[in-house]
Amino acid sequence: QGLTTPYTVAVDINGNEQNGTGILALSTFGPITAGAGYFNNQNINTNITNANFNPGLLGSVVRYSAGSLGLTGGEDLYVATVQGDLDFVKLESWYLGMQDTFNSYTLAATGKIDIAENAKIGLEARYVNLKLDNELASDDDRKNSMFRLAVDGKVSIVNARLAYTQTGKHGGLTAVDQDAKNASLGWFLTSNGVPDAKYWQAALGADILDNLNFTLNYGNLKTDLNNSPVEFKNQEVYGQLTYKMSKNLTTYLRYGTYEQKVESSGVKQTDNTRGRIQVAYTF
């Protein structure tokens, strides 16, 4: 069964999914939805080291830390949620606990505002707190957190988004998949697992046709890994042309640049240019 939580991705078009053996049940009472779940095994151990894929030295440091959790896939997993739909705003609270590994909670509020017939704005505020078990880390090193504020909108054919994410100074591991809601993801960049990160994301695009859109994306992530002598500055710019052929068939062309620099020395650790074409059909 797929693990449908803001920490995980239950269904992924590229096959990188989290699932387990167990049950997750939800019940709705008017505007309130409550649920709980238990899984006696899962495949989080195969995904956690890829939960951060930042290139260069920064990514190597973060992935090493995630790999040191020593997961086997046999750990028990506990899930609970309470959600409220108040029409103008949706509220979510989640708990996720893994046996002898971590305990975490998420608080989120999202809303949609129709300001005109062809103008809509979306808002999000999200906070995640994850604390590692005593056996895995000590004192402040156990603490991981992030908060994100985001606004997106579409006016006629123009779409835009602006988001700011900041992770805790001791740790930023708040999801077990880089595509999960509890991680802020660009293309080359992700906040997940990065301590003391300050991450800005911006996007501006337009519909060329009803089913053809071009969007330019920008990302800037800075961190000194909690006052270490090394301060990283990461920046990416990429454009994406998306063509939705049908309800189930989508293709995109993406091209952009990524740069990682050590601020103290001015040395570029990474300077990449890359492109990607993807054609995907969902059933």
Could you describe each region identified by the protein language model?
Residues 4-10, 42-46, 97-103, 115, ...:
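Gram-negative outer-membrane beta-barrel proteins
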Residues 23-25, 34, 80-82, 91-93, ...:
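Membrane-embedded beta-strands of outer-membrane beta-barrel proteins
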Residues 85, 110-224:
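Detector for outer-membrane/organellar transmembrane beta-barrel domains
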Residues 17-21, 28-30, 74-78, 85-87, ...:
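Residues that define the transmembrane beta-barrel architecture of outer-membrane proteins
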Residues 28-31, 83-88, 97, 113-117, ...:
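Outer-membrane beta-barrel strand-turn architecture
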Residues 80, 202, 243-245, 271-283:
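Outer-membrane beta-barrel "beta-signal"
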